[in-house]
């Protein structure tokens, strides 16, 4: 939706009128009087700006529509190219929009018979809404500090190519990507609903819900760096082509999350003493990657060719961080700064080997077959440690002498082997009909063993040190991990005539993960255990295009997808099988209709309707909110039903002026606040409608201007109306030929 609405104002211009002119045969009788007078400039600069006047929740408007609420202006697009007489060419393009913080500069220099250099920098901003949550039982709305959040993404790039005639082509590139800012997120953890009464950090009273919601909204602070250096060589010897690449990557990330343990404390009669802010899950990641890839394409005969690919990569990583969760200690009757996991340190290494071979066979012009096999082997090892603090048993005073510190150790090792055969077919021997099919099966067999975190060293506040070894029966695991995936599809495209086109495709996905406790080590924690999860999906894609006339077309799409999720767990089964349980069901039906009509030379109309019926049912659909008979038990699915309608009218006002009208309406009604009595309501209910009108005018052969105004309106029951917004947005642009 964000891309669509931004297109209305910036990227699309008045493209609908151009679509009118492109319809085949429409201008055949009067081509010398083509009313489209808008030229295509070889080099140009385009200045633009927009200004919203939004009432309501501006922080909700920005991420949904992709516009800065403070407006933006600058150079929307710039392009310059020039070819020299000695084979040298220069191209420059870019933009700089202040407010939206969207910038690009790209310089390309090339010379025939030598190569090219492309260097530049780009940066853009993505907006997020820091909504913490809405509690329908009390009507409370929580935001996480500043509600208007954003992430800035920047990238410097340098790409060079050396391509002399009859010589190998050499390439080198360097990219540095940066991601910084804050965004909304969520994690698994307990918060207390304001409907409950919290005194001195403890839940008291009988206010519903008695259970605690276990999804925490939080603010994620991001600071990430990613550098990539790559060198390559492409060579052709006879008919054999080879492409070799060597890549180095460096990653340095520091991310963190923060949330409020007791939201809306001391508000509207809700007593939270104290309201605890938690700085949770501070993570640092430093990694280095070395990768070498080689691809060879060798024709064996006229209708048979061989493709071989080899890849090796090694990743070395060090992770760190802190996980500090302040909590109320009922014995000491005070807040204790619990270090759930502090001074985290892990060292991991991954070695990955991949090889694939493909045979491409085309015995006749109307039949193609690809046979392939991919084999992958990887080894993953890591070990680490962290500290945990706790108040000594029975202590009522929080100080260093009463605090125990444990150093936990952990380790894991995984060996994985994946074999994937593939086949694809295409047949075009029937006039105007193309039939295709593909099948692949991913066979993954692995073995893993690990040591759950255990307190290797415990030090009391008085200096007493205790050491321990991991328990074989509770901390040490040996397990086989098998993951088998099957994907298949078959389809056909039938271009019966210019009046009728039909496309159909059926696909099937079957995925299953099995984890079997190894019997080689008697007494291990996973001895004899068996656990399996999986899912299967069957889907159909149907598309019908009907064109009664060159000026009128109907496109109908129907995409049903049905699937079941399953789980099986039985620690008493020794590597055998048990009764599989259907843990979830997914049913999706997507129906859409598009109509394009150009009744006259100067008029174009388009209408779209899209309906989605989507629900996921889990094995726990009933939400028990009360044991009394007067409160009904709600039934909860993860519904995602919605309806979207849009329409567009474009027409030519004069030889130099076009106009466009466009509107969109979307609605969903899946929210059931009654669920909050005993759980978390996942469904969303909202209504969005937007309209805009735009005019494009050519002042002369070098100058074109555009002006647009739109109105946005959004209502959300999911957030109790606290994120509603409405208001106009004004846009203008001037494009000048250089």
Stretches found by the model and what they are:
Residues 56-62, 102-106, 120-122, 130-136, ...:
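Outer-membrane beta-barrel translocator domains and adjoining extracellular loop/strand segments
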Residues 36-73, 90-92, 172, 266:
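Transmembrane beta-strand segments of Gram-negative outer membrane beta-barrel proteins
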């Amino acid at each position: 939706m964000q891309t669509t609405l931004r297109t209305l104002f910036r990227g699309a211009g008045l493209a609908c009128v151009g679509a009118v002119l492109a319809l085949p045969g429409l201008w055949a009788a009067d081509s010398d009087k083509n009313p489209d007078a808008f030229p295509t400039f070889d080099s140009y600069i385009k200045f633009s700006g927009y200004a919203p006047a939004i009432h309501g929740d501006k922080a909700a408007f920005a991420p949904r529509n992709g516009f800065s609420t403070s407006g933006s202006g600058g150079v929307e697009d710039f392009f310059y190219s020039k070819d020299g007489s000695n084979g040298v060419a220069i191209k420059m393009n870019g933009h700089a929009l202040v407010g939206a913080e969207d910038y690009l500069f790209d310089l390309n220099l090339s010379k025939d018979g030598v190569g090219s250099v492309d260097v530049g920098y780009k940066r853009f901003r993505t907006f997020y809404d820091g909504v913490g949550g809405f509690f329908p039982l009390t009507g409370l709305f929580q935001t996480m500090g500043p509600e208007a959040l954003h992430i800035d993404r920047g990238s410097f790039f340098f790409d060079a190519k050396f391509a002399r005639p009859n010589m190998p082509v050499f390439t080198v590139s360097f990219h540095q990507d940066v991601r910084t800012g804050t965004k909304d997120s969520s994690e698994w953890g307990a918060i207390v609903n304001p409907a409950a009464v919290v005194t001195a950090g403890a839940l008291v009273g009988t206010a519903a819900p008695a259970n605690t919601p276990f999804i925490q909204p939080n603010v994620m602070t991001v600071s990430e760096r990613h550098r990539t250096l790559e060198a390559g060589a492409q060579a052709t010897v006879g008919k054999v082509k080879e492409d070799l690449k060597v890549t180095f990557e460096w990653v340095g990330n520091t991310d963190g999350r923060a949330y409020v343990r007791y939201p809306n404390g001391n508000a509207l009669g809700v007593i939270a003493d104290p309201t605890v802010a938690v700085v949770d899950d501070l993570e640092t990641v430093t990694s280095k990657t070395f990768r070498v890839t080689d691809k060879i394409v060798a024709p064996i005969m006229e209708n048979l060719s061989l493709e071989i690919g080899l890849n090796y990569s090694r990743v070395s990583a060090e992770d760190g961080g802190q996980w500090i969760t302040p909590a109320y200690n009922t014995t000491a009757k005070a807040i204790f700064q619990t270090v759930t996991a502090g001074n985290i340190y892990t060292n991991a290494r991954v070695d990955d080997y991949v090889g694939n071979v493909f045979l491409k066979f085309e015995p006749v012009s109307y039949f193609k077959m690809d046979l392939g096999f991919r084999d992958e082997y990887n080894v993953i090892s890591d070990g680490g440690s962290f500290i945990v603090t706790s108040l000594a048993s029975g202590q009522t005073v929080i100080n260093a002498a009463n605090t125990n510190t444990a150093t936990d150790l952990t380790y894991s090792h995984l060996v994985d082997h994946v074999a994937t055969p593939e086949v694809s077919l295409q047949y075009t021997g029937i006039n105007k009909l193309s039939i295709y099919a593909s099948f692949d099966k991913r066979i993954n067999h692995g073995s893993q063993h690990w040591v759950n975190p255990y307190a290797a060293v415990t030090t009391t506040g008085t200096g007493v040190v205790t050491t321990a070894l991991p328990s074989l029966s509770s901390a040490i695991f040996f397990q086989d991990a098998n993951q088998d995936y099957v994907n298949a599809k078959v389809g056909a495209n039938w271009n019966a005539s210019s009046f009728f086109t039909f496309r159909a495709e059926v696909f099937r996905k079957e995925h299953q993960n099995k984890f079997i406790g190894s019997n080689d080590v008697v007494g291990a924690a996973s001895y004899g255990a068996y656990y399996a999860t999986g899912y299967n999906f069957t889907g159909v894609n149907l598309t019908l295009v009907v064109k009664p006339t060159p000026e009128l077309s109907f496109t109908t799409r129907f995409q049903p997808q049905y699937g079941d999720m399953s789980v099986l767990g039985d620690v008493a089964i020794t590597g055998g099988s048990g009764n599989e349980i259907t843990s979830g069901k997914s049913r999706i039906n997507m129906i859409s209709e598009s109509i394009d009509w150009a009744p006259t030379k100067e008029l174009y109309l388009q209408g779209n309707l899209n309906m989605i019926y989507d629900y996921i049912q889990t094995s726990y659909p009933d939400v028990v909110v009360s044991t009394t008979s007067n409160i009904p038990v709600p039934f909860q699915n993860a519904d995602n039903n919605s309806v979207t309608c849009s329409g567009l009218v474009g027409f030519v006002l004069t030889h130099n002026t076009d106009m466009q009208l466009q509107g969109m309406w979307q609605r969903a009604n899946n929210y059931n606040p009654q669920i909050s009595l005993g759980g978390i309501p996942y469904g969303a209910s909202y209504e969005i409608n937007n309209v805009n009108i735009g005019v494009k005018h050519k002042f002369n052969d070098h100058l074109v201007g555009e002006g647009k105004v739109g109105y946005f309106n959004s209502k959300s029951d999911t957030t109790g109306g606290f994120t509603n917004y409405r208001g106009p947005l004004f846009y203008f642009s001037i494009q000048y030929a250089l």
